[in-house]
């Protein structure tokens, strides 16, 4: 076997022109496959970060059954062990306590349903980026009973800072949840479903309104390394009492986004598939050329006693060596390109940019730095190389030494 390795390696460099052509074709295959997929995954990651940062976070903890029946009666008082678990984990940068419910808002002769969200506004600003969305007024103090209302709600009631809004709802276990609250600020959200009906208030005031002291409907976990999400979820699941609590990631919280990505990814897979077809024909073409050039060589080797099985194994080793070498070069060359476009993403312009900016998102297309993309596509290209090697293998099996030496 050692001799076959040596022969395969020396054969590669015996005909440098031929080897360089083969390695170049595989190199470009790896480069373009990784380059194209990196942008596609980069767009998905940016979309996820935008949507998750808009409202849900990457992970949420609720009382078991809350997500199926989102009622304030399914709120909970978090155990100290849960809070300690979240505080002690270095992958969790922070967590937001929320008390969410529904209420009827009213002013003068108008009424409208709204989402009432009691939060720690300082923490929520870190997740939802509230400061740039504040178009009028100021954030209420943590102990205040003032409200932040969305622009759509303010327009509906023709309200401004300093006016009062009536809230009518049902509190914990049927308690009355009514009150008149001053408006301290107005927020403009890019998402219509939030901009038309969201009311934020300090969590202490919300707990008092709904007669739910110390109770929460969700703990929203903030993480700065989304690639560690699955590992973090598994770790917390092992430590959490899953009979009492439920732990949901963004995929469970935003199933529509998952479906959108899956539908778009299917189109991307088709494009990558077409690219692989082109790649396959390119690699096959170089192997056809290599086989035709070496017919006499193969005939001589078989004539002097080399078994066809060893010759085939040598040829497979040659293809693997060239494939691995080309993949390493391809990954090495594409990595700084991916890094550049990750730090300096392609900026969209004109109408495309305006349509994205309308939702409050940055109109950019970044490249993903996920090494799994490079390794997976390098592996696929190597598999294509091995499949294309079937032709020279069949040629050797059918080879007649005398005829081949006359070629």
Regions found by a protein language model. Name each.
Residues 16-43, 262-297, 320-332, 379-387:
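Hydrophobic alpha-helical transmembrane segments of multi-pass inner-membrane transport and secretion
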Residues 329-376:
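Short helix-loop junctions at transmembrane helix boundaries
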Residues 37-115, 138-143:
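Hydrophobic, regular-secondary-structure patches
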Residues 171-268, 275:
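Mechanotransmission and gating elements of multispan inner-membrane complexes involved in transport
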Residues 99, 112-119, 134-204:
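Hydrophobic secondary-structure segments that place a key small or acidic residue at a functional site
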Residues 1-34, 44, 49, 53, ...:
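N-terminal Sec/SRP start-transfer signal
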Residues 288, 297-342:
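Transmembrane alpha-helical interface segments in multi-pass membrane proteins
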Residues 364-407:
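C-terminal membrane-exit region of the final transmembrane helix in multipass inner-membrane proteins
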